[in-house]
Amino acid sequence: MTIGLVGRKVGMTRVFTEDGVSTPVTVIEVEANRVAQVKTVDNDGYSALQVTTGKRKASRVTKPAAGHFAKAGIEAGRGLWEFRLNENEGSDIEAGSEITVEVFNDTKLVDVTGTSKGKGFQGGIKRWNFTMQHATHGVSLSHRSNGSLGQCQTPGRVFKGKKMSGHMGAVRCTTQNLELVRVDAERNLLLIKGAVPGAINGNVIIKPAVKA
């Protein structure tokens, strides 16, 4: 199954097993994902589900987007996401239908995608885990500097991709093979063991693990 869900990161807590073992979990609220469009190979060149979730003020919805949602007969959401489908998937799903957390009832491991927390401009030690130079013994100005940037006259430049200071975080990333501890269909919650990318209230995409 490649169909996933779009949710909102609520925060972290812990749950206890029957043996009294504490398990840290991330709580993800998954409102019903409304299907805005079903893409097919004949019409679009590939198979996919386009979904939305949440709400958005009518004044914040562009006219083309409003028409797109109205065509599917659904309420405008806070964004649009796509899930690619295999050949034998999605045949029973139509535009305007809803997908809930119950699709994960038989799933044990998931992959979670989100936007990592932005850290701003950071040096090499924090950004790339470089080792600090000595605090003394001849080091006076470069305790936290990156060190050498490369060779001298040959090649006479800094190679592309060199790990240096710069903007850290605020990038799309995925954490794989996280254990799905609990599916709460009544409250539309997923409890996932451990941490997931992103800040509280950030959008996250939950899919069945590809390496399970």
From Swiss-Prot:
GO CC terms of this entry: cytosolic large ribosomal subunit
Source taxon at top rank: Bacteria
Positions of modified residues (N5-methylglutamine): Q153
The entry's keywords: Methylation, Ribonucleoprotein, Ribosomal protein, RNA-binding, rRNA-binding
Pfam families in UniProt: Ribosomal_L3
Phosphoprotein recorded as keyword: no
Any one GO molecular-function label of the UniProt entry: rRNA binding
Matches recorded under PROSITE patterns: RIBOSOMAL_L3
SUPFAM superfamilies the UniProt entry points to: Translation proteins
InterPro entries linked to this entry: Ribosomal_uL3 (IPR000597), Ribosomal_uL3_bac/org-type (IPR019927), Ribosomal_uL3_CS (IPR019926), Transl_B-barrel_sf (IPR009000)
An annotated GO BP: translation
N-terminal signal peptide: none
The record's account of how the chain is modified after translation: Methylated by PrmB.
Family named by the database record: Belongs to the universal ribosomal protein uL3 family.
Chain's role: One of the primary rRNA binding proteins, it binds directly near the 3'-end of the 23S rRNA, where it nucleates assembly of the 50S subunit.
SUBUNIT field: Part of the 50S ribosomal subunit. Forms a cluster with proteins L14 and L19.
Name of the protein described by the UniProt record: Large ribosomal subunit protein uL3
Record lineage: Bacteria, Pseudomonadati, Pseudomonadota, Gammaproteobacteria, Alteromonadales
Gene name of the encoded protein: rplC
